[in-house]
Amino acid sequence: MLMPKRVKHRKQMKGRMTGAACRRIEISYGEFALQATECGWVDSRQIEAARIAMTRYIKRGGKIWIRMFPDKPLTAKPAETRMGKGKGSPDSWVCVVKPGMVLYEMEGVTEEIAREAFRLAAHKLPISTKFITRGTQNEG
């Protein structure tokens, strides 16, 4: 699973997810991409599950790029612990996703195969997404 090698601060504040993405909004590597249409947190396990679903469908053809990285730590307190006594220890890592952000890219396969592979991957993610191609990435 994806996670940072080392971080400056072990714990982060929750933050607010407002506005659309202004970076990572264009297709950089592949021919087809999966783009987020709503904001949310995507866990490192969900990123990996979507990657596995895509690679199993396209088999040995094509190349996949993961354009998101889980760099935000989520903390959790142990079960059956009373409130207070500080913030919990880091538990998992998430990627903050905003609308318009490109999540995955793919090339080397036909559009039908890419569309179906991204559909399978989208079922593993907690946010709504859409399929875009290199020519139609800035429409609506």
Swiss-Prot record:
The keyword RNA-binding applies. One of its GO terms (molecular function) is rRNA binding. One of its GO terms (cellular component) is cytosolic large ribosomal subunit. It holds the Pfam family Ribosomal_L16. Disulfide bonds: none annotated. GO terms for biological process: translation. InterPro entries: Ribosomal_uL16, Ribosomal_uL16_bact-type, Ribosomal_uL16_CS, Ribosomal_uL16_dom, Ribosomal_uL16_sf. Belongs to the universal ribosomal protein uL16 family. PANTHER family: 50S/60S RIBOSOMAL PROTEIN L16, LARGE RIBOSOMAL SUBUNIT PROTEIN UL16M. Binds 23S rRNA and is also seen to make contacts with the A and possibly P site tRNAs. This is Large ribosomal subunit protein uL16. It comes from Trichlorobacter lovleyi (strain ATCC BAA-1151 / DSM 17278 / SZ). The lineage of its organism: Bacteria, Pseudomonadati, Thermodesulfobacteriota, Desulfuromonadia, Geobacterales.
